[in-house]
Amino acid sequence: MNFGYFDDEKREYVITRPDTPAPWANYLGSPEYGALISNNAGGYSFARSGANGRILRYIFNQFDQPGRYIYLRDNESKDYWSASWQPVGKDLESYKSECHHGTAYTKMLADYSGIHSEVCYYVPLNQTYEVWHLKVTNASACERNLTITGYAEFTNNNNYEQDQVNLQYSQFITSTVFETNRIRHIIHGNLDWVKEGEEVDNKLAISRFFALTGAPVDSYCGDKESFLGRYHGYHNPVGVENGKLSGEMCYNENGCGALAAQMLLKPGETKEIAFLVGMKEHEEAEAICNRYADVAAQCETELKELTGYWYEKLEHFQVHTPSREFDTMINTWNAYNCFMTFIWSRAASFFYCGLRNGYGYRDTVQDIQGVIHLAPEMALEKIRFMLSAQVDNGGGLPLVKFTHNAGHEDTPDDASYVQETGHPAYRADDALWLFPTVYKYIAESGNLAFIDEVIPFANKDEATVYEHLKRALAFSVNHLGPHGLPAGLYADWNDCLRLGKNGESSFVALQFYYAMTILKQFAAYKEDRAYMDYLEEEQEKLGTLINNLCWNEDRFIRGFTEAGEVIGKRTDPEANMWLNPQSWAVISGLATKQQAELAMENVRKRLNTEYGAILMDPPYHLHAFDGALAVIYNPGTKENAGIFSQSQGWLILAEALLGHGDQAFTYFMENAPSAQNDRAEIRKLEPYCYGQFTEGKDSPHFGRSHVHWLTGTASTVMVGCVEGILGMRPDFGGLRIAPSIPADWDQFTIEKDFRGKHLHIVVENPEHVQSGCKALYVNEEKMEDNYIPVEKMTDQTKVRLVMA
C-alpha cells in the first residue's frame, strides 16, 4: 500500500492519502529557527534549541497534535473544516487533500464543499520566524462567505520540560495581549523592567507573536481554554463553531494565538493571507508584519529564494542511473536528510523531544561526512567546531553543548560536566571518527592547509589539526585493555555495549587501525618521518593482534568482556554473529581477501533479511553478560537483533570495496525508504527519510521502522553509495573513479562539482560487469588507470569511464 509518490522534478514527496500510518514529517528553517511539520500540520517550532527554545507546543507520540492549524468556516451553512485534513478530520469521501513536502517547505492542498485551499509553511531564508501562506479559491458557482481562523498554541516556557512537567511554575508566568493584527504571548511579563545581563533567577521577560497579514482581524482569542471550549478539542473548537472568537486573553494557565478574518469570495476568485509566528519583541514583530503588505508578492519571492538555496546545494552532485529509487534518494532525499542531521544532530524530531541539548560527538562528526561532497564549506565550519570540542587528552566531549565555549569547557573528568550533561565518561569511538571525516573533507576540497590550522581544545590549550589527530590516536593508545586492544569504555558506538576499562572492542580496534592508515598520509604530507615509522610499527602490531585475537574461523568477534570472555564467538548460544566487525574489517583494510569474502558471505547467510541486515544474531535473552544492555530491549528491536540502519551504509561500502556491485546495491534497496513506498503500511515511517532502526525477524512487526530523520544512517548510506556504488573516491591529488554497480546497469552519469571544476561523468558498462575499469578518458585524453589528477581537470571536464 502506498500513500503518495515522488515528484523528482520538483524535489517533493506528494502525500495523496492523509491517513498515513504515522505522522510523516518535514523540517523547516535553519539552525537559528527550526520547525517540524507533519502531513496533517502537527508539529512544533523552536529557536536554536529544541530543549531550551521551544515556541509552539507539541504532545509527543499522542495524536500528532497540536500544530499549525487553519480552520475554514462557511458562514451560511456553518460547516467548517481545516486546511490540513486534521484536526477537523472530514470524511475522506468528500474531503480531498494533498501534502507536498519539499526542501524546507510544506504545502497542503485541500478541496471541500466547493472551496480549494493551499497553505505553504516555510521559514524565510536567513530569518527567524515562520510563515503560513494561505490561498483560498471559490471553486463553486455562487458567492461564498467564509471565516478563516489561524491557531498557534504557545509553550508556557522556552524549556520543554518546564512547559510539560513543571506546571506549578509554568502555568503562572504567562499572559497574552492583542495588538492590532497580532497576539503577543509574554513569559515573565512582570520582569519587563529587567535588562539582559541583570536577570532575576536567570529569567527575563520573553515575547512571542502570532500575526495575520493580508486581511483585517475580525475576532481574536489568546486563551487556549476559551478557544477550544471545555470538553471540546482541536477538531471542534467552540471559537470556530461559533464563527466568532471570544476576545479572551490569557493571564496564567495556557496561552494561544487565534486570529479570525472574514473572506468574501466571488465564483472563481482567489484571496491570499498569511499567518506569522516568531519569538520577537513588539517593535521587531511589527516590522516583520509590515513586510507582508503585499502577501502574494512577498511570499512568492521568499519561497523562490528558499527553493533556490536548496536546489543550489543539491545540484553539486546529481546522478542518473537505471534505478529511480537510487536517484531519488541520492539527488534529493538522502542529501536533504544529511543536511537535517548535520544541522540538528539528534536534538529535535517527533521522537527526540529536545532533551539532548547539544551535539553528540560521534553523531555529528559522522553526520558531517554526508554533506562534504555537497557543501565542503559548511562541513569545514562544523569540523572546526567539533575539533574544538575535543579534550586536550584526545578524547571527545560525549555531548557538545549548543552554547559550547572552546577552551573553557568542563570534561567527563569533572563532576560538573557529568551533572550538567548526564554523560559520566568518555566513549571509546568518539574521537576516532575525526580521521575519516577530516580526510574526506581535505580530499574533497583540496584544502591541505587545513592540517596546519590551529584550533583550541575544549578545556584548555590549542594545537594544529594534525596535532589534534595525533592526540585522538594517543587517547586510544592510553586506553588499551589487557590484550592490547582498545578498551570499550562507556560505549563504542553501540551504546548497549558497556565494556568498561578492561573490556575490549574489536570494532574500535578496526577504527583504530583505519585511523593509523589515514594519519600516515597526513604524516607523509608533513614529512614527519619519525611519526610515520611509529605508525607503521604500531599498525603492524595492532593488525597482528586483531587477527590473532578476533578472527574466529569465518567471522570477526565483537570483543572481550571485562572478565575476559569472548563476545561473538561461533559457539555462543546468543549473539554469536555481529555485523559491524565484518564490514569494518573490510573498510579498515585489515581483512585479507579470504577473510573479507568469508565474513561478508556469513553476513549474507546469517544476518541479512529483506529489510536489511540485523545487528547481531541470535538476540540476547538468557545469556547476556553484565555489559550487554541490549537485553533490555525486546528481541528484534534496536540493538537487540534489530536492523540498525546506520550499519547498512557500512555494509554497502564494504561490499562495494570488494567489487560486489550486485550485493552492495541489494543492501541499498533493502533499506532505502524510496524502495519501500509501496510497503508504507509495513514500514510505517516516511518513505523519503531514513530511520534509526527497523524491527528484525524476531519481532512480530518485522519490517516496521522507527525514529525518523535524525539518524547516522543518512550519512553512512550516502557515503556507501557515493564512494562505494558510484565509486567517487577523491584523495589529496585528484579523484579515483571505481564504481561497484549492478551488472545489469548499461551506464550511468554523474554531474559533480569538484574543487571549483564541473565534472560531467559518463560510466559505460558494455560487458555488464559489477566493477573494474577498462579505460578512463578525461576530455578525450586516455588516463593511465581510473585516476584523474586534479591538474587534468578543466572548468568543464568531460569524463568517460568504460568498465570491464
Question: For each of these PLM feature ranges, what is it?
Answer:
Residues S349-G358, L399-Y426, A458-T464, H483-S505, ...:
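Carbohydrate-binding/catalytic loop surfaces
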Residues P730-I761:
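Surface beta-strand/loop "capping" patches
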Residues E751, K792-A804:
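Short, well-structured beta-strand segments within conserved domains
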Residues Y151, V165-N166, L397-P398, Y513-A630, ...:
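Catalytic cores of carbohydrate-active enzymes
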Residues Y71, Y359-T364, I368-A379, I383-H483, ...:
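Aromatic-rich carbohydrate-recognition surfaces in CAZymes
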Residues M1-R362, P376-A389, K440-S445, Y525, ...:
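Anionic coordination/interaction segments
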Residues A287-A297, T301, E305, M329, ...:
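Extended, well-ordered alpha-helical scaffold segments
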Residues V778-E781:
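Short strand-turn-strand beta-turns centered on an Asx-Gly dipeptide
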